[in-house]
């Protein structure tokens, strides 16, 4: 039976959530090996999106890119989508109404992720479940796979695409480092 590291599960107050997420992301950003931040969130008002927006200059300095899937988009959010983040980013809208039953998530790297509360709960009205996962490639890998599947099924928002040059630079830098021999 494989060893599973203990998870940091907590219930956090709304006022603390954005700050804790910001600390978690900044702790795990790695300029030497940039990894796109993969985010599934309820809306642009979600604490995880606000935490990422608060770190956008740090993300730029680390050479990172943000890929964001929103469950709820109104006209104003769609207009603001291109200005939500100043770092390189792409935003998509998961139009399927059943997505609201899913949990918010953030993948910071190949071994690090955060799982938030169910998106049907308004984060401004109640305290929320959170799960900080560190040093677990299995959990982060599953979160990344589910993100990619949802990304494929989601619709791009106009004005929210990352500059192609920034995305290509991160991809090229990542592929150069992943070409190193690995243990099988």
Residue ranges and their predicted role:
Residues 1-184:
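PLD/PLD-like phosphodiesterase catalytic module centered on the HKD motif
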């Amino acid at each position: 039976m494989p060893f599973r590291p203990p998870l940091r599960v907590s219930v956090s107050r709304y006022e603390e959530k954005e700050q804790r997420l910001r600390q978690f992301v900044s702790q795990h950003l790695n300029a030497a090996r940039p990894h796109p931040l993969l985010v599934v969130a309820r809306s642009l008002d979600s604490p995880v999106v606000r935490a990422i927006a608060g770190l956008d200059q740090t993300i730029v300095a680390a050479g990172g890119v943000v890929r964001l899937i929103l469950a709820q988009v109104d006209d104003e959010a769609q207009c603001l989508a291109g200005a939500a983040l100043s770092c390189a980013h792409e935003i998509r809208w998961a139009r399927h109404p059943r997505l609201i039953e899913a949990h918010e998530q953030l993948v910071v790297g190949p071994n690090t992720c955060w799982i938030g509360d169910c998106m049907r709960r308004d984060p401004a009205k109640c305290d929320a479940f959170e799960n900080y996962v560190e040093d677990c490639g299995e959990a982060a890998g599953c979160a990344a796979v589910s993100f990619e599947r949802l990304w494929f099924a989601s619709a791009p928002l106009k004005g929210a695409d990352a500059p192609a040059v920034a995305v290509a630079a991160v991809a090229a830098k990542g592929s150069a480092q992943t070409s190193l021999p690995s243990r099988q």
